[in-house]
């Protein structure tokens, strides 16, 4: 490895959990990685283990929809640890063991989904629904809030018992239910969960405190935080971010301080919500590192690690982000899908061999969210199919000339 990248392979701590380097595989839903009981299946274990083998210091699982009291999410495309806790623990413990063989920590992720992103779903207030401005979501009751919080804490405890190093809260970003609570434009409540900033953040801080109370201080709690919404109104995104009607960076800093005070151990920073999706899940035309300077403003004001998400899939950009002190590490989701060996190739001194994410959003977001089928990647045909598509070594290796660069030609070259 070139000494140039040394800092990216120094350890750091998330709470009391030491991470061996500055590369985090980001949480990203991958359909068909779970069985009908809401537990990881063998495909899911192979998928995450491949990223551990590829050198990531920690892998964050995709979001678990853990509510089975209010919305009762069925364990179909995403995990739900609470449907069959024993089976979940068995498979999750197997993943921890396999990733641990490579020195990689495993974090779960829990979320509530819903909010104004989904038609008819519960939201803090009856405001206009994303993509359907003439419709209004249902206002959640305090009792329903408490039941959902209870499920989140129970799921985190099960993850801790499975050997996970911590849990990430899919909470303060992307405009789902929990994120809606934080924004005055979507939260018009007059009870303890509305009004001033402390009240609006309360729904999250209560869960953070509850998780630490049940799981202990060694179990890390991280959170996704969108540091700027990039909207001028509900259902009106803003490419430039002028006339912000959602979350400003200044308010994100105050939220980050409250989260740190409540016991959050690290922030996974990004930008945008569904209304400005070109920021939340930026395509290839969005510049790499487009939000890095915004994250740096948050890091200056808190004492916990801030990790950069969103178009960070370039080795030199990763180096700049950490070396400059703008953030403490990088969170790679789509780049980890495109090349599970992203960190390893840098460590081996061959960063030019990294298969880059092209930001097409076809096999990842397109398959998993829009079409509800197995995830994939336009530049990595093995992505999410690691268990059954391992390269086979030729019985009699040969040097051959392959005419044509299509799928058949590429497979012939790999096999030879």
Regions found by a protein language model. Name each.
Residues 1-403, 407-415:
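Flavin-dependent oxidoreductase catalytic cores
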């Amino acid at each position: 490895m070139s000494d140039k990248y040394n800092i990216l392979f120094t350890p750091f701590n998330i709470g009391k959990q030491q991470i061996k380097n500055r590369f985090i595989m980001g949480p990203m839903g991958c359909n068909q990685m779970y069985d009908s009981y809401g537990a990881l299946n063998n495909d899911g274990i192979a998928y995450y283990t491949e990223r551990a083998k590829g050198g990531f210091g920690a892998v964050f699982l995709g979001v678990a929809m853990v509510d089975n009291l209010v919305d009762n999410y069925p364990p179909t495309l995403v995990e739900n640890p609470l449907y069959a806790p024993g089976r979940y623990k068995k498979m999750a413990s197997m993943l921890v063991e396999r990733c641990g063989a490579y020195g990689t920590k495993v974090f779960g992720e829990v979320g509530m989904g819903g909010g104004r992103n989904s038609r008819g779903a519960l939201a803090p207030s009856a405001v206009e629904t994303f993509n359907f401005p003439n419709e209004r979501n249902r206002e959640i009751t305090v009792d329903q809030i408490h039941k959902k919080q209870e499920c989140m804490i129970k799921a985190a405890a099960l993850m801790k018992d499975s050997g996970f190093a911590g849990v990430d809260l899919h909470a303060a970003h992307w405009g789902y239910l929990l994120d809606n609570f934080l924004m005055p434009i979507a939260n018009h409540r007059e009870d303890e969960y509305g009004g001033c900033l402390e009240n609006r953040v309360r729904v999250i801080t209560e869960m953070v405190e509850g998780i630490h109370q049940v799981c202990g201080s060694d179990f890390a709690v991280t959170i996704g935080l969108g540091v700027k919404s990039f909207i001028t109104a509900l259902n009106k995104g803003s490419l430039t971010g002028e006339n912000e009607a959602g979350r400003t960076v200044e308010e994100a800093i105050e939220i980050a301080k409250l989260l740190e005070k409540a016991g959050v151990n690290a922030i996974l920073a990004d930008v945008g919500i569904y209304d400005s999706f070109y920021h939340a899940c930026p395509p290839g035309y969005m510049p790499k590192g487009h939000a890095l300077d915004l994250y740096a403003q948050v890091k200056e004001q808190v004492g916990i690690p801030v990790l950069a998400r969103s178009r960070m899939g370039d080795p030199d950009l990763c180096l700049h982000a950490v070396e400059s002190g703008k953030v403490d590490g990088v969170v790679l989701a789509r780049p980890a899908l495109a090349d599970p060996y992203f960190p390893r190739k840098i460590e081996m001194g061959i960063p030019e061999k990294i298969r880059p994410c092209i930001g097409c959003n076809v096999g990842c977001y397109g398959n998993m969210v829009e079409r509800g089928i197995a995830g994939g990647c336009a530049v990595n045909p093995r992505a999410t199919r690691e268990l059954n598509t391992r390269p086979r070594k030729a019985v009699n290796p040969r040097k051959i000339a392959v005419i044509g660069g299509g799928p058949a030609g590429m497979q012939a070259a790999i096999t030879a």
